[in-house]
Design a protein with these regions (language model features):
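Hydrophobic mid-bilayer segments of alpha-helices in multi-pass membrane transport proteins
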Residues: 10-19, 27-48, 70-76, 220-224, ...
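Alpha-helical transmembrane segments of multi-pass membrane proteins
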Residues: 104-116, 141-155, 180-197, 393-396, ...
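Structural signature of hydrophobic alpha-helical transmembrane segments
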Residues: 2-13, 66-69, 122-127, 181-197, ...
């Protein structure tokens, strides 16, 4: 038991090192991730008995998996730099003023509704890398823009990306009975609806302060109820499309709301960014449709490809992958052998859509005369300079996650929590999902990692598994707010790389509190037989 306890404490070390360096020492994400990786390697070898070959393969898997994230960062920065170079952001700000002079509603429209829409169809950090620069272009401070997009995308991390994370969960557990499946959907969507409603109110507060919350409370509650109830109802019929459909309806509805007399009076942001001189001479000739053109093209290409199975399957048949042998530690933790590990389909990857949108945007702006001489050189230079440190951090984080997973550290950490807590485990069940997403930056990966574990705990405690499974994926969705790799995407595109610790410090307490509340609700459901 003492050895097991020592193993459990050892699993905490890489996570604690990462958090302390980010939050207390104010290290950048690349430095903190490298240190966390180093400690995970040492513990894998010394405590868990992983061989050099096994650990090396785990690092290689992490590096390969990180490529799918880096392939989102660079093209997203291309779009941002193209829009900045052309002066499109100045036009977007002016166009949003015509939509409504209420800047708080503008932020809600982009940072809550539009970001949620992007999560519904794309995911993989795209809502953050697209939404943050748009908000900055509208006058929001970079740090605030990152916080807003992290909040806005959270609720869509289970049924967004065409239900990918939900599919990951049900692939690991037994929800074959239709009644059990329906109960799981109701539990999950009810909690996600609350997450979304709270996020909307917080975004109103970040944009407009206490007055922003008070002035927009009715609008946020109505839209939140529409999204929450709509997602629940549609998910019972089609989990794949439920988030995308309600997000699309909400996107149309908020533009109708913006035309109401109530929102025709000017309202300023609570703490706006300072105005900066930009390419306003060129941008002033541009119309709002041209300014949004790269983003509109991104939406169209993503919808056409991802919602059309014939196109998606045709383009998705070309995949890149590596084969990896299975290994085991001295303690008996085994990894699977893969003939094709984590296949990357480049033509249906979010990065391909972003890159294509950036290229089309550049060509159009160049033809329209909005790109100055030397524009391409500046765009590529700025994009590469921002991508490199972000890529180092992402590689470090994903390699650390994979080393901990494959050498048994993550499993021991979760099992230790369940063994120690026993009957009060339901209180902590959302935190397991949160931990999985924090470690992997993906609710899909979290559900695959811990979905069956939650089911086994329910069996061990002889309790209903449905609330625990809902807690798993809802906790994972909340975890997307504090996921280091996702935060890195935001700080990179917002131009505040190195402030990842500050971002985490702003959202960590709220994420933990929300998980604690849901944990209490789930615990109460067992006590009172809900």
């Amino acid at each position: 038991m003492s050895i097991q306890l020592g193993q459990w404490f050892a699993t905490l070390v890489p996570i604690l090192v990462l958090l302390v360096l980010l939050l207390h020492c104010k290290w950048g994400g690349d430095e903190a991730a490298s240190a966390g990786l180093l400690f995970s390697l040492l513990i894998a070898y010394v405590v868990f008995g992983g061989g050099i070959d096994m650990i090396a393969l785990a690092v290689a898997k992490g590096m390969w998996y990180s490529l799918s994230i880096v392939l989102v960062v660079f093209p997203a920065l291309i779009i941002y730099e193209v829009s900045r170079e052309s002066g499109a952001f100045a036009v977007i700000r002016e166009g949003m003023q015509r939509f409504t002079p209420d800047k708080v509603l503008q932020v809600l429209a982009v940072g809550w509704i539009f970001v949620g829409f992007l999560q519904g169809i794309t995911g993989f950090g795209v809502p953050v890398v697209v939404g943050a620069p748009l908000l900055i272009g509208m006058g929001v401070k970079p740090l605030t823009a990152v916080l807003i997009t992290l909040l806005g995308q959270a609720w869509g991390n289970t049924f967004g990306t065409l239900g990918l994370a939900w599919d990951g969960l049900i692939s690991q557990v037994d929800l074959s009975d239709s009644l059990t499946m329906s109960r799981a959907i109701i539990w999950t969507t009810a909690m996600l609806g609350i997450v979304n409603l709270i996020a909307g109110l917080l975004i109103a507060g970040l944009a407009g302060g206490a007055r922003g919350v008070k002035r927009n409370a009715v609008t946020v509650i109505l839209l939140g109820l529409l999204q929450g109830a709509g997602q629940m109802g549609i998910a019972l019929l089609n989990p794949m499309l439920c988030n995308f459909i309600v997000a699309s309806l909400s996107l149309g509805l908020i533009f109708v709301i913006g035309r109401l007399d109530y929102y025709r009076q000017p309202v300023e942001l609570f703490d706006p960014a300072e105005e900066k001189a930009g390419n306003t001479t060129v941008g002033s000739k541009m119309n709002i449709q041209q300014a949004f053109m790269p983003y509109l093209f991104l939406i169209v290409i993503a919808v056409v490809v991802l919602l059309n199975d014939s196109i998606k399957n045709y383009l998705g048949q070309w995949k890149l992958s590596f084969a990896f042998a299975g290994k085991s530690t001295i303690l008996g933790f085994e990894t699977h052998s893969y003939s094709a590990y984590a296949p990357l389909a480049p033509l249906t990857h979010s990065g391909a859509f972003l890159l294509l949108a950036g290229i089309v945007g550049y060509i159009c702006y160049l033809q329209w005369g909005y790109i100055q001489a030397g524009g391409m050189k500046r765009i590529l230079k700025n994009s590469l300079n921002k991508t490199i440190p972000s890529a180092i951090a992402v590689i470090g984080l994903t390699a650390m996650s994979k080393v901990m997973d494959e050498t048994g550290q993550t499993t021991v950490l979760a099992q230790g929590v369940a063994a120690v807590t026993g009957g009060i485990y339901p209180l902590l069940s959302p935190f397991i999902g949160l931990l999985g997403t924090f470690m992997t930056s993906s609710n899909l990966s979290s559900n695959i990692l811990f979905g069956s574990f939650q089911q086994k705990v329910a069996l061990m405690l002889q309790i209903d598994k449905v609330p625990l499974l809902a807690a798993q994926t809802v906790g994972g969705a909340i975890g997307s707010i504090i996921a280091p790799s996702k935060i890195l995407l935001g700080t990179t595109t917002a131009g505040i790389l190195g402030q990842e610790g500050l971002v985490i410090s702003k959202v960590l307490g709220g994420a933990l509190l929300l998980c604690a509340i849901f944990g209490a609700v789930i615990f109460a459901s067992y006590q009172f037989g809900w």
